């Protein structure tokens, strides 16, 4: 499939519209596990706080994202959507959204050319452009800044989902190139400390096991990076009985890893001995071609950071004498001239979405509730140019919306106790500088 033309009136492009009913049934299941989004639908029922909003969205087109999209439309927004990764789309989810009449341009296994074509389609709302951006990774934001700068004057705000995209926002701001106020959704406590940590704790092992059927117990695994994603990834592998080793550049994160019982080494210290390597840094060139050549025969290599730059895939694919054989979609065996081979998952892209279905619905409800609140805040209030985080009371609100489903009963302060702590009786309970 190859698509290169602009089609301003195209309403959708998905792999198979006949999968819409399957997608719809899974969306209904997911709604039961996404109490935050469903609570916002109920809270704003009939109020339409996003009426008039034209949201260009670029975020993994999964079942959980379908619940987000339909929440945005129920709150009054007009939405056009693409995925932020060539492998992360769940085709039945995309089909269900297309069937519901919401413009979506996404399918699993896009080429790079098709990926950018899909992003282009999110920008056209008839003869108008978007007035809001909802992004994951920063590609849509960068695309509009670089290719359609004239549209930026109409855009009220950007909400960015992930660590990599947030880094890009701060870089643009520092260089004076960011032209639209933005919300850093990733650094909401109820996003980074839940999605990044608890989501990866469940979805990393799911992706590796679906792809390879490998038994993790007893294996030696290397996790590169011990931020929130790395912490969740290390726990994911350890919980299945793997012996986990961590690499880090940050002495604080390295000390945390050591205090959690992980050995902290450098890649070159251990690469020849490990069975599984996971990159989780958001950086470039973490695993080089030289590292791959040194890996054990049959070792598994994957990435759970946003982009495919953490592993030197281009060098691997262009190395003379190296052969590539597809075992199944997103599972490739690379054989070196000496006869040794390694297994690379999802072409070095997000393994949990490329080889499985990503994070569970409940934790994505936390993240996406933040997204909706950020969109409402940016659309209805004029912000000066800058990068903001959601205020503490909204962060606490997101958490509170998810407690009942888990059977949580919160202790309530009395006025004397609140006065003693110096906090409002109903919160916020922590200062902005508090580190959870």
Swiss-Prot record:
<feature type="binding site">
    <location>
        <begin position="225"/>
        <end position="230"/>
    </location>
    <ligand>
        <name>NAD(+)</name>
    </ligand>
</feature>
<feature type="binding site">
    <location>
        <position position="136"/>
    </location>
    <ligand>
        <name>substrate</name>
    </ligand>
</feature>
<feature type="binding site">
    <location>
        <begin position="304"/>
        <end position="306"/>
    </location>
    <ligand>
        <name>NAD(+)</name>
    </ligand>
</feature>
<keyword id="KW-0963">Cytoplasm</keyword>
<dbReference type="InterPro" id="IPR042172">
    <property type="entry name" value="Adenosylhomocyst_ase-like_sf"/>
</dbReference>
<feature type="binding site">
    <location>
        <position position="352"/>
    </location>
    <ligand>
        <name>NAD(+)</name>
    </ligand>
</feature>
<dbReference type="GO" id="GO:0005829">
    <property type="term" value="C:cytosol"/>
</dbReference>
<keyword id="KW-0520">NAD</keyword>
<protein>
    <recommendedName>
        <fullName>Adenosylhomocysteinase</fullName>
        <ecNumber>3.13.2.1</ecNumber>
    </recommendedName>
</protein>
<keyword id="KW-0378">Hydrolase</keyword>
<feature type="binding site">
    <location>
        <position position="283"/>
    </location>
    <ligand>
        <name>NAD(+)</name>
    </ligand>
</feature>
<dbReference type="GO" id="GO:0033353">
    <property type="term" value="P:S-adenosylmethionine cycle"/>
</dbReference>
<dbReference type="GO" id="GO:0004013">
    <property type="term" value="F:adenosylhomocysteinase activity"/>
</dbReference>
<keyword id="KW-0554">One-carbon metabolism</keyword>
<feature type="binding site">
    <location>
        <position position="196"/>
    </location>
    <ligand>
        <name>NAD(+)</name>
    </ligand>
</feature>
<feature type="binding site">
    <location>
        <position position="62"/>
    </location>
    <ligand>
        <name>substrate</name>
    </ligand>
</feature>
<feature type="binding site">
    <location>
        <position position="161"/>
    </location>
    <ligand>
        <name>substrate</name>
    </ligand>
</feature>
<feature type="binding site">
    <location>
        <position position="191"/>
    </location>
    <ligand>
        <name>substrate</name>
    </ligand>
</feature>
<dbReference type="InterPro" id="IPR036291">
    <property type="entry name" value="NAD(P)-bd_dom_sf"/>
</dbReference>
<feature type="binding site">
    <location>
        <begin position="162"/>
        <end position="164"/>
    </location>
    <ligand>
        <name>NAD(+)</name>
    </ligand>
</feature>
<dbReference type="GO" id="GO:0071269">
    <property type="term" value="P:L-homocysteine biosynthetic process"/>
</dbReference>
<comment type="pathway">
    <text>Amino-acid biosynthesis; L-homocysteine biosynthesis; L-homocysteine from S-adenosyl-L-homocysteine: step 1/1.</text>
</comment>
<dbReference type="InterPro" id="IPR020082">
    <property type="entry name" value="S-Ado-L-homoCys_hydrolase_CS"/>
</dbReference>
<feature type="binding site">
    <location>
        <position position="195"/>
    </location>
    <ligand>
        <name>substrate</name>
    </ligand>
</feature>
<dbReference type="InterPro" id="IPR000043">
    <property type="entry name" value="Adenosylhomocysteinase-like"/>
</dbReference>
<feature type="binding site">
    <location>
        <position position="248"/>
    </location>
    <ligand>
        <name>NAD(+)</name>
    </ligand>
</feature>
<dbReference type="GO" id="GO:0006730">
    <property type="term" value="P:one-carbon metabolic process"/>
</dbReference>
<comment type="function">
    <text>May play a key role in the regulation of the intracellular concentration of adenosylhomocysteine.</text>
</comment>
<dbReference type="Pfam" id="PF05221">
    <property type="entry name" value="AdoHcyase"/>
</dbReference>
<dbReference type="Pfam" id="PF00670">
    <property type="entry name" value="AdoHcyase_NAD"/>
</dbReference>
<dbReference type="InterPro" id="IPR015878">
    <property type="entry name" value="Ado_hCys_hydrolase_NAD-bd"/>
</dbReference>
<comment type="similarity">
    <text>Belongs to the adenosylhomocysteinase family.</text>
</comment>
């Amino acid at each position: 499939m190859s698509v290169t033309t602009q089609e301003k009136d195209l309403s959708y492009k998905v792999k198979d519209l006949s999968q819409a009913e399957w997608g719809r049934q899974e969306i209904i299941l997911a709604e039961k596990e996404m109490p935050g989004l469903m609570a916002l639908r109920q809270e704003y029922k009939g109020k339409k706080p996003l009426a008039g909003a034209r949201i260009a969205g670029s975020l993994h087109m999964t079942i959980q994202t379908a619940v987000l999209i339909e929440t945005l439309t129920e709150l009054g927004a007009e939405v056009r959507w693409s995925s932020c990764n060539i492998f992360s789309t769940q085709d039945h989810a995309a089909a269900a959204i297309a069937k519901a009449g919401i413009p979506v341009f996404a399918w699993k296994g896009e080429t790079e050319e098709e990926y950018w074509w899909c992003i282009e389609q999110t920008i056209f709302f008839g003869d108008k452009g978007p007035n809001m951006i909802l992004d994951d990774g920063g590609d849509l934001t960068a695309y509009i800044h670089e290719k359609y700068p004239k549209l930026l004057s109409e855009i009220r705000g950007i909400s960015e989902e992930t660590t990599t995209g947030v880094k890009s926002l701060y870089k643009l701001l520092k260089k004076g190139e960011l032209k639209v106020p933005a919300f850093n959704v990733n650094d909401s406590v109820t996003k980074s400390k839940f999605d990044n940590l608890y989501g990866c704790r469940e979805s990393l092992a799911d992706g590796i096991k679906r792809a390879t059927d490998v038994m993790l117990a007893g294996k030696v695994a290397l996790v590169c990076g011990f931020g929130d994603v790395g912490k969740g990834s290390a726990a994911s592998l350890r919980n299945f009985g793997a012996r986990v080793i961590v690499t880090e550049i940050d002495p604080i994160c390295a000390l945390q890893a050591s205090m959690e019982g992980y050995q902290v080494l450098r890649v070159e210290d251990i690469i020849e001995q490990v069975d599984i390597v996971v990159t989780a840094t958001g950086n470039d060139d973490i695993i080089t071609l030289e590292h791959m050549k040194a890996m054990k025969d049959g070792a598994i290599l994957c990435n759970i950071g946003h982009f495919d730059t953490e592993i030197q895939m281009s060098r691997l694919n262009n190395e003379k004498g190296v052969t590539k054989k597809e075992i199944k979609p997103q599972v490739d065996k690379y054989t070196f001239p000496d006869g040794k081979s390694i297994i690379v998952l999802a072409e070095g892209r997000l393994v949990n979405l490329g080889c499985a279905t990503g994070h569970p619905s409940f934790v994505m409800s936390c993240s996406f509730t933040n997204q909706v609140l950020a969109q409402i805040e940016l659309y209805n209030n004029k912000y000066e140019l800058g990068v903001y985080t959601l205020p503490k009371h909204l962060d606490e609100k997101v958490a509170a919306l998810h407690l009942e489903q888990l059977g949580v009963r919160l202790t309530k302060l009395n006025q004397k106790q609140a006065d003693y702590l110096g906090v409002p009786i109903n919160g916020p309970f922590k200062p902005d500088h508090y580190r959870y």
